[in-house]
Amino acid sequence: MFYTEKCKGLSVKTASGKINALYGMKDSKGYASAGNDLFCSGQAGMLGVVLDPNFKKNNTIYVYSTSSKYHGSGCKTNFEKCDGNIVMKFKVNKNLTKVSDRTDIVKDIQYKPFESNQPFGGPGAHNGGRMAFGPDGYLYVGTGDRHRGVCGQDNTLLCSVVLRIDGNGNGAPANKIKADKRIFTYGHRNVQGIAFRPTDGQVFTAEHGPWHNDEITALVNGGNGGWDPHEKRAGRGA
């Protein structure tokens, strides 16, 4: 079983019960290797891992994490455009003791680098991070709104969306969002789960709703999940 720990890294528990620490965050200890660009802050960090459908043949896994590698000037001056969450692809050796050949297949999922009062929230808020392969063979990646009202209804950004991509990060050709062909649906608050109905492949997300009422959403290609927290409105923002 592969798993991630938000502020530590990627590990695997083998059939014998042994735990192998594979790939750590910056300054982590005890891992076979580490990414110096990977960090945790608030709710951000290493948030998800999924095996390739052909893992038994290609030993490939995908990991979702927060990274400083692609921050750029946007993270200092305009955090609507701060690219700080990524999807990485790795090869795992046959003994399940180390990973190699890291490739960043998605580099521009937005991250919140500093605190805001309205909508409120500290650095690293609402990153999503859940991933799953669908019966169609594509990788579905759920992101979050970063507690920023601009995300929900802006389908040019990769916050508040579900991506549907291939193993190299390219959008599925049938995706209907023209602004960015990697996007399958938009208008999500903070995706915490992705699952597919066995009978017909219908995809569902579990995600945060306003206040404490979380929700299950049935996704439709090109659809809008409806999360629209206008900035500076009365009541709760993003």
Task: List where the protein language model places each region.
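Beta-strand initiation motifs
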Residues: 17-21, 92-104, 170-180, 223-227
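Aromatic- and glycine-enriched pocket-lining scaffold segments that form the walls
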Residues: 120-146, 155, 160-161
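Beta-propeller domains
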Residues: 2-27
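Asp-box/WD-like beta-propeller blade repeats and closely related beta-sheet repeat scaffolds
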Residues: 74-132
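Surface loop/turn motifs at the tips and blade-to-blade linkers of beta-strand repeat domains
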Residues: 23-26, 38-41, 106-109, 121-123, ...
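Beta-propeller domain segments
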Residues: 4, 11, 30-40, 44-46, ...
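Generic structural signal for coil-to-beta-strand starts
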Residues: 9, 60, 137-140, 201-202
